[in-house]
Amino acid sequence: MNAKVESLREVFENEEQSIIHGDLHTGSFMVNNDQVKVIDPEFACWGPIGFDLGCLLANLIIDYLFHLTNNEEYCLFIIKIIYNILSTFEKDLSEKIPKNYKTIMIDSAAYAGTEIIRRTIGIALAKEVSIMDEKGNNIAFRKNLLIIGIDLITNSEKYGSCENFIKRIKKLHVN
């Protein structure tokens, strides 16, 4: 896993594929009936295309796992959001940059894993992790997040398509 994370760091530092937001999550969007705006670009920089997608997916996966035992309808909504994001991204990438899109999708999964781990044990904890800490249920929740984060990193190639990503996420469970 260390080699994979080092590889992701190298890509982040050296692959200037696009201007990226650098901190993309569900709170980065303002939406109304007519438009979507992305806000808070203070971490924007040149970087790998898969980084922002990975950060957004991590945020959604953490939320999904947080609600998995008590809100099935909301979890289905999260799966639909992940599906819509990934299927649109996959379609657009495969048309516009066909020889690189698979790598970008795989990198997105791996970056999602690193972001889940960072938001689980780092300084900037996910709100869901803090809530579980307050409830005293943090050990199992954090363990599950770390397992998922590690799987996204070490098995990122298995998440390399929208269909495979959704299948693997639907298999998540809470111990």
Give each language-model segment a name.
Residues 91-100, 157-160:
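Surface-exposed helix-capping loop/turn segments at secondary-structure junctions
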Residues 97-112:
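All-alpha amphipathic helical-bundle segments outside canonical DNA-binding/catalytic cores
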Residues 50-96, 112-130:
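Active-site activation/catalytic loop segments of kinase-like enzymes and analogous catalytic loops
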Residues 13, 17, 22, 46-49, ...:
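Active-site-proximal structural scaffolding
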Residues 1-21, 32:
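ATP-dependent phospho-/nucleotidyl transfer catalytic cores
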Residues 26-67:
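Catalytic activation segment of kinase domains across protein kinase-like and atypical kinase folds
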Residues 113-175:
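ATP/Mg2+ or Mg2+-diphosphate-binding catalytic cores
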